[in-house]
Design a protein with these regions (language model features):
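C-terminal catalytic histidine-bearing segment of alpha/beta-hydrolase fold enzymes
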Residues: 263-322
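Short beta-strand element of the alpha/beta-hydrolase
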Residues: 95-103
């Protein structure tokens, strides 16, 4: 695979100057482009100086030709051919690596609260991190999963060099659906996660239980084979005894993704004798990610009352699955 060290483009700098910046100075050590050869214009300010084209062939195009855009909170929209992976290497790696799938209803990637801030937390614990800025499906249901599979291929091929011997996945909301897809719809041992962490995930495509926008953007309501796709991407139906051990976290007052999604997946894991831990807190709603008060200010984290408990439980579990 070719390695290129390229300067920032003037156009890219210009667009970034208008963008908001995250409440963290952490930046990736490397940014890997899954399909294209160079990072073009983007308002995204979180990328590495070292850009590496991975050289994967794009099997399915999401047919999105709009430029990327970003919100004040770091929600990165319209990711297409510049699908990329931000790599973060800890000073003292413990052998674990986590592929991070931010949420966003398959419309955008919440690249700060469910990406960058996750990486910062993981790095402090010696975990190598790959934050995946995956393509939006735009009704092409295989697109995000193709990006995850290629991310695992790239990470597995470099694992020995990085001092990594275990690679898992974490996903939030629609990114949780993607992480659960990676955990149930893997192709081989290379693409199979060693463990899975799902935070307020979308699991089912069942109308009335799923998140409507996630379903529509993934499989489109007008698809000829819609009912077959709905079954395939209702991931509680895809769990087997080979599904990786799982950690699930959510709030019972979630008004965006019903808690029943997580319960369906939990029950399927239990039925298939897959080790699972699930934590349900009474309040916090949806989308709290790793956006703690140190990023948003005191009193602005709806999950502050339980965050320490969540982080301690996750840290313990990550040590136990080693």
């Amino acid at each position: 695979m070719k390695r290129l060290l390229i300067p920032a483009l003037a156009a890219l700098i210009g667009s970034s100057a208008l963008a908001q910046s995250p409440k963290s100075n952490l930046r990736p050590d490397e940014t890997v482009l899954l399909y294209c050869d160079a990072l073009g214009e983007t308002p995204d300010v979180v990328y590495a100086k070292k850009i590496i084209p991975a050289g994967f062939k794009m099997e399915v195009d999401n047919k999105v030709d709009r430029p990327e855009s970003i919100s004040q909170g770091g929600d990165l929209s319209d990711i297409s051919k510049m699908a990329r992976v931000d790599l973060y290497f800890p000073k003292k790696p413990n052998g674990q690596m986590v592929v991070v799938c931010p949420g966003g209803g398959y419309r955008y990637a919440a690249s700060w609260r469910e990406g960058l801030y996750v990486a910062e937390w993981m790095l402090e614990r010696g975990i190598t991190v790959a934050v995946l800025k995956y393509r939006i499906p735009n009704g092409n249901c295989t697109v995000p999963l193709e990006d995850v599979h290629n991310t695992f291929r790239y990470c597995r091929s470099n694992a020995e060099k990085w001092g990594v011997d275990q690679i898992g996945v974490i996903g939030f909301s629609a990114g949780g659906h993607l992480a659960a897809s990676a955990s149930t719809l893997w192709i081989d041992q290379v693409t199979r996660p060693d463990f899975s962490i799902l935070v307020y995930p979308v699991i089912t495509m069942e109308i009335g239980v799923t998140h409507k926008g996630t379903r529509e953007r993934l499989i489109k309501e007008s698809a000829v084979w819609n009912h077959h796709l709905a079954d395939k991407y209702s991931l509680q139906k895809q769990v087997t005894r080979f599904t990786p051990k799982t950690f699930i976290a959510l709030c019972s007052d979630d008004k965006v993704v019903p808690a029943e999604n997580s319960l369906m997946y939990y029950n399927a894991l239990i039925d298939n004798d897959v080790p699972v831990e699930m934590y349900i807190w009474p309040k916090g709603n949806h989308g709290w990610g790793f956006e703690a008060e140190k990023y948003v200010g005191k009193g602005n984290d709806p999950f502050a009352y339980a965050r320490q408990e969540f982080e301690a439980s996750l840290e313990r579990w990550l040590k136990e699955v080693r």
